Amino acid sequence: MANVDKAIVFGMRAFHCGIVSPNEYIADYVKTHPEKLIGFAAVDPMQDNVHEVLEHAIDDLKLRGVKLAPIYQNIHPLDDRMWPVYEFCEKRNLPILIHQGTTFPRKAPLKYSLPILLEDVAMKHPDLKMIIAHMGHPWIDETIVLIRKQPNFYADISALHYRPWQFYNALTIAKEYGVMRKLLFGSDFPFTNPDATMEALHNFNKMTEGTNLPKLPVEEINNLIHSPTLEYLELA
């Protein structure tokens, strides 16, 4: 943690896929470096006690955001059971980090993972802050047009750099649509780490050396690395 100023940490709560991280574990981890770590709560809207889990995580454990993963939880983002979570987070000014993109478990339904499904959420809860993880890959275009039109929607770049062509297209299209400032730095640790993500950003333009393909201005790259995530999410 020596080289880290601030980091958001979280687990996942998806009983359908057998991934259940106790929020108490995250809260205890935050206590090891309270000046550097911000914890998010993981909730599974498929569980009947989701409201109790939310209240305990926020009020008792002092976690400051919420992690959702509809594709892992086997639930449509617009399912009736999702709306109380959105409403709770909007009222409490809690940002939601949502995995709205592909994944590898066979039992995780892709039909629930399209980023464009979140447009109705943004329309009904305009003050809700939401971050689409991994830019919603491979449906990156949907994510970009969504965050362009919704002021409180963002996307993070975690877990993209080890797919170089997708990484290149994602940032290039984001630049063309004028939404680079809506992209947040992320690593997807432990699958990769912040150093690897920063190295990929610093080497971004090397991918197209010797070609006429567009380059990304160094200033844009540096702005992404130093994106004011905590200010955007009101967590500073």
Please provide the spans of the model-predicted regions.
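Catalytic pocket-lining loop regions of alpha/beta-barrel enzymes
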Residues: 64-65, 78-185
